[in-house]
Amino acid sequence: MPFSLCAQGEVDKMLTNLHWLGHASFRLDASRIIYFDPWKLPKDSRKAGIIFISHDHFDHFSKDDIALISTKETVLVTDKSVGRQLEGKLVCKEIKSLKPGNKIEVSNGVKVQAVYSYNLNKEFHPKEDGKLGFIVTIDGISIYHAGDTDYIPEMKDYACDIALLPVSGTYVMTADEAANAALAIKPRAAIPMHYGDIVGSNSDAEVFRDSLKDKVEVRILKKEK
């Protein structure tokens, strides 16, 4: 379970500071600048306080993009595979390599629970690989970045204020499956991701939204350039 759940007004405020950068990449402008799976970033991107990398596939783990936003004060949180590849090769304060089930305090006021992220009936993301989703708590808000996953049994035990869920199908769950995941998790707001690049289209995000009408609030974020 995450560390806290909060009021809707606080969630709405946090959502105004959450920026979809395309695919599974997000930036959160909170008390720390946080990135999830940064990829194809513009050269003038803001520097990161914390970077979360879910797994080692190229569209989630971009060494060039990580280097672009890292400083000597940046903390990177990731799985064991990415941690091994970056050890000693990145200018940053620290690399924290986690496995599903780990809970840590990344820095003052920022906590993370590493959770499972895997496929049930596809070969792309085996459970035994230890790829990650993250439930991050910052400024009293819990945000779940699911990584590349299907709708998995563990999700019924996850809770968060904001859920970032893949919807494209092919490598991850479909929009309908993602809607079922959202119903299991019951976030205050759900945001579709993992579409519009490589696989998936705007229609997947719309199917996800329509499937959850009057059940879970869905925000389709505009991709920032």
Regions found by a protein language model. Name each.
Residues 36, 52-53, 113-117, 165, ...:
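Redox-cofactor binding/interface segments in oxidoreductases and associated redox assembly factors
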